[in-house]
Amino acid sequence: MFKKSVTYFGLPAFILFLLPIFLSTSLYAQVADTPWPMFRHDLQHTGRSPYGSIQKPILKWVFQTQGPVTSSPAIGEDGTIYFGSKDNKFYAITRDGKLKWAFETQGEVESSPAIRKDGTILFGSWDSHLYALNADSSIHWKYKSEGGIISSPAIAPDGTIYFGSWDKKLHAITQDGKLKWTQKTADHIVSSPAIAPDGSIYFGSGDYYLFAMKPEGKAIWSFGTRYLLDASPLIAPNGNICIGSEDAKFYVFRSDGQVEWTFDTLYDIDSSAAMDTHGNVYFGSGNNSIYAFTPDGKLRWSFETGASVSSSPAIGADGTIYVGSRDKKLYAFNPD
C-alpha cells in the first residue's frame, strides 16, 4: 500500500518539463560530464540524479516533431537537448526549446543518445547504423550493423562502445567506430547494456536470456527466463543485477549469476528499474502498478495507475520518484 504523497500531471503529447531528473554529473572518464549524458543517467543505469527536485512543475515549452518520440533525451554540456523521433530524425534543441539542427537517418530513431567526453553524440537508428555526430551535426563516423538499433549505447571508461541490435548481436566497437567483437544471441537485442565497475557487461535479449560478458568478449554466465528481456539491467552498488522480464517477474541476481530474489507481478515488465541511495528499487509493470522494494526483496509499497507502466523511473536528489504511465499521466512519488 502506498503511504505518502503522489502528484501527477497529464501528458497528452511529447512535453518536456525542465525537471531536475535530467540534471546530473557523470562519474565515468569517457562519458561527458553533463547534466544527463546517457540513457538512465550512468553506466549502471541507476536513473538517479544528484540534483534537487521541483515542488511545482511549470510547463516551459513544447517541441513538436513529425512522429512519436520514444527516445529518451540526453543533455549536453551547454544545455543542448538531444533525442530521436520516429520521423527518422535525430534532434538537437536549445534549453529554451528552439531547434538547433535535425539530422535525418533512413529509419526511425528510438535509441537514446549517449554523449562522449569530447562532445561526440552517439545513437542508433532503425537504418542499422550507429551514428557518431559532432556537435554541429556533421558525421564523425558511422558503424553499420545487420539490423535496426533500438538499444542505447554505453561508453566504457576505456572508450569501448557497447550496444545491441536487431541482428541478434551485442556489438563492441572502438571509440573510432571499428569492430572489436560481437556476441551472438538467438534473438533481437533491444535491452541497453549496463557496465559494472569491473568492466563486466550485462544485457537482456529477445531469446529470454540475461547475459554477463567480460570486456574482451568472453561469456561469464547467462540466465534464461520464460519470455522477452527487452528492459535494461540495473547494477546495484553491491554488484547485484536487477531486471524485469516479460515473463512477469522482476529478477535480482548476484554477480555470479545466482538468483538473489524474484517478484511476480503477474504481467509483463518492460520498465527498466531505478535505485535510490538506500538501495531501494523502483519499477513499473504491465499490471498498471509501480513497485518499490527494499534491497533484500521486501515490498515497501505499490501504487496502481490507470494503465500499464512501461516508463522507466527517474529519481531526484530529494528522493522523489518520477514515472509515467499509459494513462497519460506523469507521477511524482514521495519515497516513503
Model-based region annotation:
Residues 30-336:
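Extracytoplasmic/lumenal domain signature
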Residues 2-5, 21, 239:
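Mature extracytoplasmic/luminal segments of secretory-pathway proteins
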Residues 25-29:
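Sec/Tat signal peptide C-region and signal peptidase I cleavage site
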Residues 12-24:
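Bacterial N-terminal signal peptides
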Residues 2-15:
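Bacterial N-terminal signal peptides that target proteins for export
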